Amino acid sequence: MSKIILYQEDARRALERGMDILAEAVSVTLGPKGRNVVLERKYGAPQIVNDGVTIAKEIELEDHIENTGVALIRQAASKTNDVAGDGTTTATVLAHAMVKQGMKNVAAGANAIALKRGIEKATQFIVTQIAEYARPVEDTRAISQVASISAGNDIETGKMIADAIDKVGREGVISLEEGKSTITELEMTEGMCFEKGFISPYFVTDTERMEVIQDNPYILLTDKKITLVQQELLPTLELISKTSRPLVIIAEDVEKEALATLVVNKLRGIVNVVAVRAPGFGDRRKAMLEDIAILTGGQVISEDAGFSLETLTLDMLGQARRITITKENTTIIAEGNEKDVKSRCEQIRRQIEASDSSYEREKLQERLAKLAGGVAVIKVGAATETEMKDKKLRLEDAINATKAAVEEGIVPGGGSTLTHLANDLKDWAEDNLIEDELIGALIVERSLTSPLRRIIENTGQNSAIIIEQIKESEFNIGYDAAKGEIVDMYDVGIIDPAKVTRSGLQNAASIASMILTTECIVVDKQDEK
C-alpha cells in the first residue's frame, strides 16, 4: 500500500488537529458541572459516559493522519488509567495544553530537543513538589471524600466505598456486581483473592476487560500437574457437562495437550471451563489450596490424601457464588461455610503464635488476611442498562482513586494543586534553566492551569480572574465549581489522590514532548472510494 509522508510543520499541524478533536470531546466531562457524552453502539442501547478514557477509546477519525494525533493523546489517558485508575480527563487536558503551547515555540524556531529536556525537568520538579505537599490518608472521612469526587460528586457512593475499605482493610478486595434492584448496596461476603490468573487467554468471557467471570461454578482443586487427557480430564468434564454449570480448575499446572482439550471444550460451548495455576510453592501451595477448599466446601484432590482425578465425584468439588479471573488475579466469592472458615482462621492464628521464624509468620499472616478479610461486593443498582454501565465506570474510578490515595496521600483537588505549583515552577525554572530549556519549563508552567481553567469554563464562569485569585492564595485554597466559591479544599473535602495528579502530569508531559519532537509522519494512503 502506498504511503503519505508529511514533514515538519505540516506533520505537527495534522497531529494537532486530531488532538483538538479528542481533547474537546473529553474535556467537556471535567469537573462537577461537566457534561456527559453519548457513545453510539453497533448493538444495543447507546452508552452515556462521563469517563475520559472510555470516550478516548471510542474516537476514530476518517483522516488517517489526524487519527494518529488522537491515538497519541489517547495513550496519555490510558497510561494514567493503568497506573492510577483515574485522572484520565486531566491527563488529556494537560497533554493538549502542552502541545498547543509547544507548537507555537517550535514554529517560532525553538529547538524541540531542548524544549523536551525543559519539559522533563519541569515535570520532575512538580512531581517532587506534589510528594512534599501530599498529606497521608488517616481517616475514613478523607477516603469517602476522595471516592465521592471520583464518582462524580456522589456522597453516598463515597461513604459506601469508605465503609467497604473499613471492613476489608486497605489491602482488601472490593468487587463490583450488577445488582437486581435500582438501589446500590454494599455486601460483605466470604471470599479471597490470590495472585494467579488464567493460564490461556482463550478462556476469557469478557473480551473488553480481559476477564473470566463465572457465576455459581464448581471448583476442582488439585496439587498435581494435569497431563493425561483420557484418564484425568475427560471423566471430570463429563461429570460437569451433565450439570451445565461452569468449572474452575485450580491445579499446579495443565500440560499442553490437556490445556488444548479444555480450550476446545470451552470454545465449542460444551463445558464453560477455565484453568488457573495454584498460588504459592511447595508446602505453602498445599496449605493455600486447603484454605480455598475450606472456603468453597470442596476437597483438595491430592495423592497424599488418597484421592485421584480418575475417581472424582461431584461432592469433592468446591462451589462458589462467583469467580472473577484476570491475567494476574483470581477473586473467589463464596458463601455458607462461615463455621469452617472461622475454625481454619483460628488454626492459622495458633500457627502464627507457635512460629519462631519471622518469614514464616509473615506468610501465615498473609494467608490469614486472605481468608479472614473477605470480599466487599458492591451491587450496582440502576433503572436502565445505560445508567448501570455509567454507574459501574464511576464506581470503578472511585475505588481506584481511593486505593491511589491510600498509597501516596492526598492533595487539594479541582485542579488547584497544579495551579499553585505553577508559581513555584516559574521561580525554580528562572533560577535553574536557560534558553530553550527554560521555555520548555514555562510551557509546562502555563499548561498547569488548564485543568482548573476547563473546570471553571464548564460552569460558565470567566476563568482568568478566578485563576489569578487562587494563584495568590494559600496552597489549600481552590475553587469549588459546584457552588461557585473560593474555599479551603481540605475543609470542604475536594481532594485528589497525589498519585492521580502525579501520573496524569507525567504521562501528559511524556506524550507532549514526543509530539513536539516529531519531524515526519508516515501513514497509509486512503483508498479513493
UniProtKB/Swiss-Prot annotation:
Q: Which domain of life is it from?
A: Eukaryota
User: What are the binding positions for ATP in this chain?
Assistant: 29-32, 86-90, 414, 480-482, 496
Arranged from A to Z, the UniProt key words for this protein are: ATP-binding, Chaperone, Chloroplast, Isomerase, Nucleotide-binding, Plastid
Gene3D superfamilies listed in its UniProt record: GroEL, GroEL-like equatorial domain, TCP-1-like chaperonin intermediate domain
Which CDD domains does the entry link to? GroEL
Q: What is its EC number?
A: 5.6.1.7
Q: Does the keyword field hold S-adenosyl-L-methionine?
A: no
Q: Name one GO molecular function term.
A: isomerase activity
Which SUPFAM superfamilies is this protein grouped with?
GroEL apical domain-like, GroEL equatorial domain-like
For the keyword Cell membrane, the answer is no
Q: Where in the cell is it found?
A: Plastid, Chloroplast
One of the protein's GO biological processes: protein refolding
GO cellular component terms attached to this protein's record: chloroplast
User: Do you know which PROSITE patterns this protein is assigned to?
Assistant: CHAPERONINS_CPN60
Q: Name one Pfam family in it.
A: Cpn60_TCP1
Signal peptide from the UniProt entry? none
What's its catalytic activity? ATP + H2O + a folded polypeptide = ADP + phosphate + an unfolded polypeptide
| Job description of the protein | Together with its co-chaperonin GroES, plays an essential role in assisting protein folding. The GroEL-GroES system forms a nano-cage that allows encapsulation of the non-native substrate proteins and provides a physical environment optimized to promote and accelerate protein folding.
Q: Which PANTHER family match?
A: 60 KDA HEAT SHOCK PROTEIN, MITOCHONDRIAL (PTHR45633)
Subunit comment: Forms a cylinder of 14 subunits composed of two heptameric rings stacked back-to-back. Interacts with the co-chaperonin GroES.
Family assignment from sequence similarity: Belongs to the chaperonin (HSP60) family.
The molecule here is called: Chaperonin GroEL, chloroplastic
**Organism name:** Guillardia theta
